Structure formats: structure tokens, C-alpha cells
Amino acid sequence: SMEEIVSKNYIIEENPDVVVNIVDAANLERNLFLTLQLLSLRKPMIIALNMIDVAQKMGHEINIRELEKKLGLRVIPIVASRNEGVEELVDAIRSEAGITRETPVLEEFFDRISEIEDTVASEDMREEKKTDLTYEFIESISTDILKKPEDEKYTVSDRIDQVVTNKYLAIP
């Protein structure tokens, strides 16, 4: 999306001390795609896991420590609308500025992305393979970090997103 392009360009050009990636906890898997793109820039980053209250009301159980371990990042649960967790987020920003961490899981993912970039000639095929690999990675870590109720109710917005963001059905 245009927002993702602008975000990535800003981070590359301005070289911030730390990137605060605000992630919607209720739609964690969808948001991890951008998170992985930002991580590929190798900049210090913190995840502000916003709307954690909404995710909990939906019956989602997020293993924050496991998410931190998999991504090598501090993950701070917040409810921005009620100013909950914001002080902890500010403290994390101060302590994490300038620090990058890498995990074996992430390194393996980035190595596989590099392999695709080095071996696949067609730009379109390269992007498709990288996208597939990214979704596979998200799915693999999601099983360790996210538990959802079996009978989860989907909102109209969720159903629209499933079609619009589908790699085969989405409008290019």
C-alpha cells in the first residue's frame, strides 16, 4: 500500500533511532506482513500491540513473550484510546533506541528471502515467491503466539479484508 511505501522510504532516508510499529492486536496476523517488511530494513524497532483489550474480548490469547522471542523485539501491549501501556512504551523507546536484535528464526527467514532475490530471474515471480514465503512464515509463528476461539465471529470488515488482501483475488 501507499502507506507502507511511505513508511519504508521514511525509515530508510531518515534513519530513526527506533521504529515504533503500531500493530492492531485484534488483527495480528495481517499486521505481521508489514512488521516483517520493516524488520528487513534492519532498524531498531518496538511493537506497540494496540487494542489488546479488543483482541482479548474476541477471545484471542497472544503470547507476548513468544512473539518477542520469535521477532527479537520488545512488544508492549497498549490500549491507546485509554492511554494504557503508553508510559511503558515510552520507557521502551528510550531503552531500545539504537539497538537491533536478530533471532535464528528471523535470520533463516531473511536468508530464504535473499536466496529468492538471488535465484529467481523474473521480478513478478520473485515478488510472488517472497510474498508466499512471508505468509508461510507468519502462519508458522502464529501457531506459537496466537490462540483464537474455534467459533470466532468475523466482522463485515474482516470478510472484506479476506477478499481484498487475498493474493489471488485482490485487485493489483
Residues covered by each model-derived region:
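Pre-Walker A segment
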Residues: 148-162
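Conserved C-terminal guanine-recognition region of P-loop GTPase G domains, centered on the G4
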Residues: 2-76
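Hydrophobic alpha-helical transmembrane segments
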Residues: 159-172
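Alpha-helical transmembrane helix bundles of large polytopic membrane transport and channel proteins
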Residues: 46-47, 56-151
